[in-house]
Amino acid sequence: MLADIAKHSAIEVKLPKAHKKNSSSGSSSPTSPATRGNNKRSASWTDYGTPPNAAWLHEKIKFPAKTHVTKVASKLPPTANGIIYLPGAEDKYYEDSDQGPAFRQRRHFYYLTGANFPGCAVTYDLHKDHLILWIPYTDPRTILWYGRTPTLEEVRASTDVDEVRYVAGVNRYICASLTPGASIYVLHPDQAPQLESPKGVVQIDTHSLRPAIETARVVKTDYEIAQIRRANAVSSAAHRAALSRLSRLGNERELEAIFAGYCIAQGAHTQAYPIIAGAGPAASTLHYDNNNAPLKPHQFVVLDAGCEWNCYASDITRTYPIPGSFSAEAKAIYHAVLRMQRECVERIKPGVVYSSLHLHACKVAIEELLRLGILHNGTKEEILARGTIAGFFPHGLGHHVGLEVHDVSGRERLLLDSKSSLGPAGGVKSARCRLSPSKRELVLPETLAVMFRDEMKEGGGGDGQGKGVVQMQKAKRSAGGGRQRLEEGMVVTVEPGMAYFLDVPYHAHFINKKALEQYWDLGGVRIEDDILVTKTGYENLTDVPREIEEVLKVMNPS
């Protein structure tokens, strides 16, 4: 199989599909295999699914550096005056070695420049509205070993900066440009420039720039959406390639190899995060990365994988039955998660409070588990009020996607977590909610209890539009502000899941352990798409089969 991956990379030209609101996340059928004169099959990537249009995929688009930096400047305090300064990343080496990891540019720096090579810096004069990218000069003696960096002219043609200069002069420029009372805005104290002869006292501001950049990055520009769209096109095709071969695979690592090889063949050399290929019990581990266990019949396998395109991430998850059919139990659990995802995606539009989608997913999960008899001895409202569903759906519904797979979310956050103290018999005595960071974290039962209690108390309808939710948005909580509303231009994931139950006596009353035993060995289920918020709704950027009939058709084309 690895030989096939290395040898064949034929590309069929076909534009990727886009999914608008009220359309399901459909799939492309596998392309018919190519044949030669003797009717023997000629292996190529088109056997595994239709690749993205190569001309569209590799189209050169000038990086909108000036647009990005002016967005950032608008988020700084109104009195801001001086120079924004960011150094780029440098090459790194492993300890006691002349080798090192692949270069990875600092994401905030890349957002302002589009420069993806080491040794650079950027300055932006707030008063003059002047953006300069500073690049390293390549010593001719090093070209033999490492090649050359782009020239001044080549860089200027690729990114919309006002000027490109060699980095050796950056400190002299800053010293000459500073005026009395001006500041240098940096992300961290250790990134401040080392100035030899500044004019008077230099004010270094380390507090204003980071929130300004992170807020600017939340709503994507057209360029950023184009790159995320391309990352999704390649990753979607790679998922279809892996799905089409799954019934012939014997180990998780083979699934990983097909996905990674396909992405590389299309020009996406970097994964946005380590590929997760986990079967059976490992399918319930959110960040599983061993990818080395056998694929056993009558289990699920989760493939959570997405490549980068021009530093922009994709994040796609699918769950498939091994070897290629759903048992009754597998179909029931998969349908529950699919319904959670489908209904949450359909609710996406500007103005919706994202955390309300998580709460809706929890309600759907409870309805489905009650239907299957896994939950019992209570109503949907009683089970949700206690937070029991967090044992089955233990992680957040999603996150922003951009230059990071778990991208920044600005001054507000998508979801809430909690620090709680439990009263008698595990009851919630108090819960102190805080805004969670963008990375995926556990959503505790106490958190759900607080969210549900607030919704009931304040009259929210669970759709992010109700009176209670509006009141919560306006009332800036002492714990850290309002819950984030979706805006046009955001790209977020929707990834509900069904996993294990945390065995706590406080929740045992609602759990039918005998019924649950039928589902333990299957493993977890997660389904995840990348969703662009549009003016009136959403667009699903991901094109991978998720409906049961579509999945089986690709796995069993005959």
Curated annotation (Swiss-Prot):
Keywords: Aminopeptidase, Hydrolase, Manganese, Metal-binding, Metalloprotease, Protease. It is an enzyme of class 3 (hydrolase). Mn(2+) 1 binds at residues 315, 495, 528. GO terms for biological process: proteolysis. Residues 1-15 have a biased composition (Basic and acidic residues). Binds 2 manganese ions per subunit. Residues 34-46 have a biased composition (Polar residues). InterPro entries: Aminopep_P_N, Creatin/AminoP/Spt16_N, Creatinase/aminopeptidase-like, Pept_M24, Peptidase_M24B_aminopep-P_CS, X-Pro_dipept-like. The keyword S-adenosyl-L-methionine does not apply. Residues 1-46 are annotated as: Disordered. Mn(2+) 2 binds at residues 304, 315, 528. Residues 23-33 have a biased composition (Low complexity). It catalyses: Release of any N-terminal amino acid, including proline, that is linked to proline, even from a dipeptide or tripeptide. Its EC number is 3.4.11.9. Its cofactor is Mn(2+). One of its GO terms (molecular function) is metalloaminopeptidase activity. Belongs to the peptidase M24B family. Catalyzes the removal of a penultimate prolyl residue from the N-termini of peptides. This is Probable Xaa-Pro aminopeptidase PODANS_7_5850. It comes from Podospora anserina (strain S / ATCC MYA-4624 / DSM 980 / FGSC 10383).
